[in-house]
Amino acid sequence: MAKENLPIVFGPVLSRRFGKSLGVDLSPSKKQCNYNCIYCELGKAKPIERMEEVIKVETLISTIQNALNNLTTPIDVLTITANGEPTLYPHLLELIQSIKPFLKGVKTLILSNGSLFYEPKVQQALKEFDIVKFSLDAIDLKAFERVDKPYSKDINKILEGILSFSQIYQGQLVAEVLLIKGVNDSANNLKLIADFLKKINTARVDLSTIDRPSSFKAPKLSEDELLKCSLFFEGLCVSLPKRSTAQAKKLVSCGIDELLALISRRPLSAEEAPLILDPNAFKHLETLLNHKQITIKKVGSLEFYCAF
């Protein structure tokens, strides 16, 4: 899908999960991706192996530097993305190494589908980022092909790449799992994903469903269904979409020992806690913190209550 006159740099925009972000689009004029995801809001496009239109790295660097110099408000993060997959950009390492020196107190983030993490050149570039967010919508091969419609269907190679990168990466590794009703929300697929993410140093799992117009017909999960799916990710910091007022009224009442057991199974986001815990249960959090039975872990702009 061609897009005319779209800027390379956009924002700042406020991200609930990462704070105030200035975005950088490595493919502003055209969708260039090795996936053709069922939920993609950019429209349908044939998946490609390599970028066909490549912006000069010097152009990107000067454009980013100019945008940073003209900011009127502070930002938390510089986000590298694309109308497609940013790790397809052949000069990614040079780009990130060139812009980091003039980022003062600003974290760097890249949004990727994770498909090329096995490539040494891609790994070298990704190591330079403070936060790497990758997608993992399916491990079950049939679900993977239906959801992501990839150029390469070698899911094992993709998983090996993510695993090997996680072993050398020192920053925050965030996984995104987008679920579509009747496609990749089976117990088998969820267990496969959760088991894999527990093997790697995943700082946070962003679990979501369809919330925007997509390329193909893609039914969304309800808030209750998404919450049930999150139970598969026991022991991981899971971020769910912000709850509606109706959902927020369903408060949990529990004693301090029950609350500690709950947090031991699944870390609780600080944003979610006042929405799902009744006032008495919410007060137990302070007691558990004071007794050093739980701690607060920050991932991006989100905080989680975690057991020691």
From Swiss-Prot:
The organism's place on the tree of life at top rank: Bacteria
Disulfide feature: none
Cofactor(s) essential for the protein: [4Fe-4S] cluster
Keywords assigned: 4Fe-4S, Iron, Iron-sulfur, Metal-binding, S-adenosyl-L-methionine
Residues annotated as binding [4Fe-4S] cluster: 33, 37, 40
Cofactor: binding comment: Binds 1 [4Fe-4S] cluster. The cluster is coordinated with 3 cysteines and an exchangeable S-adenosyl-L-methionine.
Gene Ontology molecular function, alphabetical: 4 iron, 4 sulfur cluster binding; catalytic activity; metal ion binding
Keyword 4Fe-4S among record annotations: yes
Ranges where the Radical SAM core domain occurs: 18-247
InterPro entries, A to Z: Aldolase_TIM, GTPase_Obg, rSAM
Signal peptide start and end residues: none
Pfam families xref list: Radical_SAM
PANTHER family found in the cross-reference section: FEMO COFACTOR BIOSYNTHESIS PROTEIN NIFB-RELATED, UPF0026 PROTEIN SLR1464
Stated family: Belongs to the UPF0026 family.
Protein name: UPF0026 protein jhp_0109
UniProt source species: Helicobacter pylori (strain J99 / ATCC 700824) (Campylobacter pylori J99)
Biological classification of the source: Bacteria, Pseudomonadati, Campylobacterota, Epsilonproteobacteria, Campylobacterales
